[in-house]
Curated annotation (Swiss-Prot):
This is Cyclin-dependent kinase 1. Phosphorylation at Thr-14 or Tyr-15 inactivates the enzyme, while phosphorylation at Thr-180 activates it. Residues 4-306 form the Protein kinase domain. GO terms for cellular component: cyclin-dependent protein kinase holoenzyme complex; cytoplasm; nucleus; spindle pole body.
Amino acid sequence: MENYQKIEKIGEGTYGVVYKARELTHPNRIVALKKIRLEAEDEGVPSTAIREISLLKEMNDPNIVRLLNIVHADGHKLYLVFEFLDLDLKKYMEALPVSEGGRGRALPDGSTLSRNLGLGDAMVKKFMAQLIEGIRFCHSHRVLHRDLKPQNLLIDRDGNLKLADFGLARAFGVPLRTYTHEVVTLWYRSPEILLGGRQYSTGVDMWSCGAIFAEMCTRKPLFPGDSEIDEIFKIFRILGTPDETIWPGVTSFPDFKPTFPKWKREDIQNVVPGLEEDGLDLLEALLEYDPARRISAKQACMHPYFQHGSSYYSGRARRNGFH
């Protein structure tokens, strides 16, 4: 760790403390140091985790927070060195004026982002394009996120959104609680995971993307459950209780109960008022119960909501087209 000088603690992530630090070999480079707290501290870092994380260093995409380095210290400590961004989507939404559905909170100290960016329709579309393109890139490399939420969507000084923590779930698992014993949020978790499914795929990230989309539009979480069953019921109350006709195989999930209340589906237009028709169509495609029919990131990039293609709105057209 001699190459890094910690400046301050900036947060407590799912896996451990996050520091703002200076890279001493490049004195002008500020980085985020994520200290990964491993379950079995005495056993050292599992080689599988090191392998998984090493693969993430190769993930280079403008929509992904860049993993710059992996530092293995004292045998059982692991630090991940990421590019530094001081703002996340949760804080960004909270900083919006109360008149725009935010809480008028101050941006983090030293945040260089202009306060007047707001979160109007065009900004939501841009953030969605960047989010979906980032997910598409990761899925094309067979990497899932599994824990997408506004807290790990970071925003740079130019008002561009980048995905953080991609691939960490596979390396370290998704804990039920953070290392400080805070409960990991369930608000963005897909129904197949909540119902105890063991086999899941890229659709889990697309569901999270839908919940985040709705929250950007309304400034309120769509399914703010405070336990697994409350989360399931919050979903059922809005989207209706699924059955075999809507979601073939749903009754076979380990945690599905035939005694679940039978709620009718709400009109999505009433849930997210003001969202344009193509946006509502994309939202419904993201919040499709059946993961086999849920829209993929690749399909979402070409959805009519992004009339000119997602790269037009993300502002991040790639030289060599899509991966």
